[in-house]
Amino acid sequence: MRVVVQRVRAASVAVDGDIVGKIGTGLLVLAGFEEADSETDLDWMAGKIVRLRLFADESGVMNRNVLDAGGEVLAVSQFTLYASVKKGNRPSWSRAARGEVSQPLFERFVTKLSATLGKAVPTGVFGADMQVSLINDGPVTLTIDSKVPE
């Protein structure tokens, strides 16, 4: 499982011009899956995202997590995180999980993220052509891979 986590002042996701998910201050999470991903990956990633200390404390030091900051999380599925550009100029998506595998993974990930966060996590529409808008705060942007936990 691979994610891009961005600290935002606001973020939204729209499908066909209609906003289907939005948050204020918090984290925008773009999530991609591969066939080998398991419940262990989902659990680890949900816990890691909620515990990341990406928000400033009263001293201006990034010591607070999204819960401490009273923030929200918006999750958007994004299979392109598993693109390979090693050969040629057209990305290959062969490492990305097929839709019938990745959709249940994404849904379970959002359920775990919501449970860890203690509130509902809005999402985009799986498999749809989506438009994501955000006000990146910092900017603070991280990439995290559950198979390479650095």
UniProtKB/Swiss-Prot annotation:
UniProt keyword RNA-binding, yes or no: yes
Keywords recorded for this protein, A-Z: Cytoplasm, Hydrolase, RNA-binding, tRNA-binding
Signal peptide (UniProt feature, chain positions): none
InterPro entries listed in its UniProt record: Daa-tRNA_deacyls_DTD (IPR003732), DTD-like_sf (IPR023509)
Motif placement: Gly-cisPro motif, important for rejection of L-amino acids: 138-139
Main location: cytoplasm
Entry-linked Gene3D superfamilies: D-tyrosyl-tRNA(Tyr) deacylase (3.50.80.10)
Compartments where found: Cytoplasm
EC nos: 3.1.1.96
One GO MF term attached to the UniProt entry: Ser(Gly)-tRNA(Ala) hydrolase activity
Cellular component GO terms, alphabetical: cytoplasm
Biological process, per Gene Ontology: D-amino acid catabolic process
Main EC class the enzyme belongs to: hydrolase
Record field: catalytic activity: glycyl-tRNA(Ala) + H2O = tRNA(Ala) + glycine + H(+); a D-aminoacyl-tRNA + H2O = a tRNA + a D-alpha-amino acid + H(+)
Subunit note: Homodimer.
Family: Belongs to the DTD family.
Domain characteristics, as noted in the entry: A Gly-cisPro motif from one monomer fits into the active site of the other monomer to allow specific chiral rejection of L-amino acids.
Role noted for this protein: An aminoacyl-tRNA editing enzyme that deacylates mischarged D-aminoacyl-tRNAs. Also deacylates mischarged glycyl-tRNA(Ala), protecting cells against glycine mischarging by AlaRS. Acts via tRNA-based rather than protein-based catalysis; rejects L-amino acids rather than detecting D-amino acids in the active site. By recycling D-aminoacyl-tRNA to D-amino acids and free tRNA molecules, this enzyme counteracts the toxicity associated with the formation of D-aminoacyl-tRNA entities in vivo and helps enforce protein L-homochirality.
Protein name: D-aminoacyl-tRNA deacylase
Taxonomic path: Bacteria, Pseudomonadati, Pseudomonadota, Betaproteobacteria, Rhodocyclales
